[in-house]
């Protein structure tokens, strides 16, 4: 029972109690209860309170609808100013949920007159078996009604009309949306009584049942409506539209009697065969997506209506497949709906005779939810392919199958629309004409409606034998055929950027060179960073000439054509640097810090540590953000063309552990510690202090490094282990902070933990003037806050949260590392940094050499983000 009905019942009970007390002879009781009863009655009768209760009832009804139809979206419902629940069904039909209690309260209204709640007023009548049906006849003020069958085709925007429903009066068309499907068709009118949808008669249906019927109606919706005839007795000259008939109003009470009357008068097609559709039906779609006239919207009349309401829209199933020589034998595609409610990885086709086909449990349009217990939520198509590729011989798939409802319709229309896109059949030989590249920028040209899903990203996976000859081939709108997920098979990814827009990214197609690939598709889709596998002399000369103009004659331009291994990256670690102007980081540069000898770059042998990355596969890296550079390097295809700059000045030694160790040993004692271990942030040239040491070697070293721009030189130490004895340093914190910056560092003894390390000192700052704190010190605590294994954010908050005045800082001093310890800690990786003061940077203090850095992480598989050691 609705809350409003409960309140009405309570109101009646309280009024009865009040009446009984008023009629009693107990003045004391009357005096004690009069005020309370009046207050309660005033609240229960208050119009605002009743409206709130009505809204609450609408929300309860909405919850019930959501439980039955989980695919409902925010745009599918609303609550009007009267508090009524408004449901937008099937993309556009609107149903106003009618409250019978409100209907009875307006029973004094004239028949057919709309009340303020949007319902239809009715006169009180004796309850009988046919009382509900009699209400239908009472809607008409004439003795005759016109019956018409109308078929509308939902174009994806809805049918464009609104309805109101009451239990006794049936379903009435309330509004016609201008420009909608019904408005363009012109046959449906406001005030029409809807008698039937498809083969389902709406006699005595409640709103929930009508909602279920509308949700099952599909794309082609056939309505049988009745409207009053203005003339009391129709004459032969009465103009009837095609597919219409005039019947006595009394026969509308009984659907069976109405049908018999129509048959006897020569109009059997109104309740039988479909009328002419208002929109031409297309027949070019794949058979499984063809809407078969009215049969696509019919519901088995033998199904109980209560059972119909409980039918689920989806079902989930678990399937175990064993790979054969051809893999799984399914093709997948990624879809994203505009409403963002229908998205994921779907089965697009099943290869005959494959493991998936023989299982008999996988169907086209099934959505893959999990692979071996791993959820695919948020996975791109490429990531899903990778996961399936890495699965074992036996694969457990969890699938979701759409059986009915809006998502089912949207998925059918989406795949049908995609099937219309130009593509090359699998059997097309390589000499077939090339299709025009797809470059669609609006949903109107890619899908038949605004709510249709779009295929945003697909991947290509060749058949096993394709690896022995030419590059894999796929269709223009490439799909992922999971038929070669065998051991040792290589996945060549066709990765286009996936954004949230409505466009399909244009692809470039090239012909196959070998007719033996005819059983695959006739075209391939190039990788977005594709480059020619061979470097011609002319191409190399042109690249060098272009970059020589940019970097100048002091830099040698090196071009390397590299072939990546089937698994892994380039085998380099990367270092990013910037210049600092006015406290802002400008002019980013990217250097090769180290090269794995047996990696692709190391085997190629052209590039060296210290070379600056300028371009890769035609993509300019100079001036690009460091994170973007790392992302590009990780996405490169097998063929890589790297353009680097190498300083012709021989005094600039390449970055290597041996070189940095020698530099550290040679120059470590040239300057006092307070001058050596300072981060320089100046834009000027670096100069050495002439008063520190004499000799030709010092002068030569100073001259060689005086030409370097400031790169925020870092501590001259390669330390990665610290003393077990903490040292307490007290610094006086002022308005400009403590004068040092920190970074988090992977614990060499436990890769899961991080350490906080002093990164650099601000020249002239508190820490630098004190002289006891040096870069490389491990931060243990600040005042009473333990930071031994704290995160960077926690350390920053502890330092910034320290009050002005004396701050007690506990540090562990670094210990010198042996060669063995260096190797043991080669996996340590610096990840991020924070500067803990806003003090303007003064001119750089004298310093002489590039830093010796802690060894970077992963010297092989992928480029690493090494923080700005030479800033």
Curated annotation (Swiss-Prot):
Domain PDZ per the UniProt entry, residue ranges: 149-229, 318-403, 559-648, 728-814
A cellular component annotation (GO) from this entry: cytoplasm
GO biological process: adherens junction maintenance; adherens junction organization; apical protein localization; cell-cell junction assembly; establishment of planar polarity; establishment or maintenance of apical/basal cell polarity; establishment or maintenance of polarity of embryonic epithelium; establishment or maintenance of polarity of follicular epithelium
Highest taxon of source: Eukaryota
Ranges of residues in domain L27: 3-67
Localisation: Membrane
Biased segments, Low complexity type: 437-451
Phosphoserine PTM positions: 682
GO molecular function, one term: myosin II light chain binding
InterPro entries, alphabetized: L27_dom, PDZ, PDZ_scaffold, PDZ_sf
SMART domains registered for this protein in UniProt: L27, PDZ
Primary subcellular site in the record, as a coarse category: membrane
Record's compositionally biased regions (Pro residues): 840-854
Residue pairs linked by disulfide bridges in the UniProt entry: none
Tissue occurrence: Expressed in primary and some secondary epithelial cells such as ectodermal cells, salivary glands, foregut, hindgut and invaginating tracheal cells. Also expressed in specific cells of the peripheral nervous system. Expressed in the germline.
Stretches the record annotates as Disordered: 100-134, 420-453, 822-871
Compositionally biased spans, kind Polar residues: 822-833
Alphabetized UniProt keyword annotations: Developmental protein, Membrane, Phosphoprotein, Repeat
Pfam families, per the entry: PDZ
Family of the protein in this entry: Belongs to the Patj family.
Protein purpose: Involved in cell polarity establishment. Probably participates in the assembly, positioning and maintenance of adherens junctions via its interaction with the SAC complex.
Protein name (database record): Patj homolog
Organism: Drosophila melanogaster
Gene that this sequence comes from: Patj
């Amino acid at each position: 029972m609705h809350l409003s009905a409960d309140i009405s019942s309570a109101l009646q009970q309280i009024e009865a109690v009040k009446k009984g007390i008023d009629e009693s002879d107990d003045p004391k009781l009357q005096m004690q209860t009069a005020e309370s009863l009046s207050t309660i009655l005033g609240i229960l009768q208050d119009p605002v309170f009743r409206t709130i209760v009505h809204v609450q009832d609408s929300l309860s009804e909405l919850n019930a609808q959501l439980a039955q139809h989980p695919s409902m979206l925010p745009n599918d419902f609303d609550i009007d100013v009267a508090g009524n629940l408004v449901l937008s069904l099937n993309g556009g039909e609107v149903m106003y949920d009618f409250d019978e209690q409100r209907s009875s309260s307006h029973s004094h209204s004239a028949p057919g007159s709309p009340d303020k709640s949007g319902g239809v007023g009715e006169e009180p009548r004796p309850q009988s078996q046919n009382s509900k049906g009699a209400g239908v006849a009472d809607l008409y003020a004439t003795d005759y009604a016109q019956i018409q069958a109308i078929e509308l085709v939902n174009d994806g925007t809805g049918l464009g009309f609104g309805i109101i429903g009451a239990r006794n009066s049936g379903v009435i068309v309330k509004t016609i949306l201008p420009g909608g499907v019904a408005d363009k068709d012109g046959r449906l009118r406001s005030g029409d009584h809807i008698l039937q949808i498809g083969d389902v008669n709406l006699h005595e249906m409640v709103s929930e049942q009508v909602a279920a019927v509308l949700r099952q109606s599909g794309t082609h919706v056939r309505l049988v409506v009745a409207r009053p005839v203005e003339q009391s007795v129709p004459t032969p000259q009465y103009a009837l539209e095609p597919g219409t008939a005039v019947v006595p109003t009394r026969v509308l009470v009984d659907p069976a009697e109405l049908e018999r009357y129509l048959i006897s008068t020569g109009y059997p097609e109104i309740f039988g065969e479909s009328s002419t559709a208002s929109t031409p039906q297309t027949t070019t779609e794949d058979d499984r997506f063809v809407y078969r006239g009215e049969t696509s919207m019919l519901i088995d009349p033998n199904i109980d209506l209560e059972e119909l309401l409980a039918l689920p829209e989806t079902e989930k199933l678990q399937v175990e497949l064993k790979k054969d020589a051809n893999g799984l034998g399914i093709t997948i595609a990624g879809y994203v709906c505009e409403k963002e409610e229908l998205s994921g990885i779907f089965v697009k086709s099943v290869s005959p005779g494959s493991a998936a086909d023989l299982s008999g449990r996988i169907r086209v349009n099934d959505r893959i939810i999990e692979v071996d217990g791993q959820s695919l939520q948020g996975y791109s198509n490429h990531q899903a392919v990778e996961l399936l590729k890495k699965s074992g011989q036996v694969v457990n798939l969890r699938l979701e199958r759409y059986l009915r409802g809006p998502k089912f319709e949207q998925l059918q229309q989406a795949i049908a629309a995609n099937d219309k896109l130009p593509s090359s059949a699998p059997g097309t030989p390589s000499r077939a004409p090339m299709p025009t590249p797809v470059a669609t920028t609006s949903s109107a040209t890619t899908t038949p409606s605004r709510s249709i899903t779009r295929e945003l990203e697909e991947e290509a996976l060749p058949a096993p034998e394709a690896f022995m000859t030419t590059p894999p081939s796929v269709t223009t709108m490439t799909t992922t055929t999971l038929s070669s997920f065998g051991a040792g098979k290589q996945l060549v990814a066709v990765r286009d950027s996936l954004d949230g827009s409505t466009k399909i990214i244009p692809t470039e197609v090239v012909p196959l060179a070998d007719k033996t690939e005819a059983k695959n598709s006739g075209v391939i889709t190039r990788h977005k960073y594709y480059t020619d596998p061979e470097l011609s002399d002319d191409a190399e000369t042109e690249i060098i000439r272009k970059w020589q103009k940019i970097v100048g004659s002091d830099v040698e331009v090196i071009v390397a054509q590299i072939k990546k291994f089937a698994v892994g990256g380039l085998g380099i670690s990367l270092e990013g640097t910037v210049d600092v102007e006015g406290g802002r980081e400008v002019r980013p540069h990217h250097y090769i810090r180290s090269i794995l000898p047996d990696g692709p770059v190391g085997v190629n042998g052209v590039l060296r540590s210290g070379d600056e990355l300028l371009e890769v596969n035609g993509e300019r890296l100079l001036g690009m953000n460091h994170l973007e550079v790392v992302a590009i390097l990780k996405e490169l295809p097998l063929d890589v063309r790297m353009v680097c700059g190498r300083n012709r000045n021989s005094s600039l030694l390449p970055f290597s552990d041996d070189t940095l160790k020698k530099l550290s040993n040679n120059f470590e004692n040239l300057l006092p510690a307070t001058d050596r271990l300072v981060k320089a942030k100046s834009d000027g040239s670096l100069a050495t202090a002439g008063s520190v040491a004499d000799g030709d070697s010092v002068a030569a070293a100073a001259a060689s490094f005086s030409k370097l721009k400031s790169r925020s030189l870092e501590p001259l130490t390669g330390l990665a282990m610290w003393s077990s004895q903490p040292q307490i340093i007290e610094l006086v914190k002022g308005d400009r902070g403590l004068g040092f910056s920190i970074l988090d560092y992977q614990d060499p003894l436990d890769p899961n933990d991080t350490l906080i390390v002093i990164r650099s000192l601000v020249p002239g700052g508190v820490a630098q003037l004190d002289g006891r704190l040096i870069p490389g010190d491990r931060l243990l605590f600040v005042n009473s806050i333990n930071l031994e294994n704290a995160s960077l954010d926690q350390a920053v908050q502890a330092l910034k949260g320290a009050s002005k005045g004396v701050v007690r800082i506990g540090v562990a001093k670094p210990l010198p590392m042996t060669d063995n310890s260096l190797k043991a800690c080669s996996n340590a990786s610096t990840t991020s940094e924070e500067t803990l003061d806003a003090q303007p940077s003064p001119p750089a203090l004298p310093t002489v050499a590039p830093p010796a850095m802690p060894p970077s992480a992963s010297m092989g598989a992928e480029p690493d983000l090494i923080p700005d050691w030479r800033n």
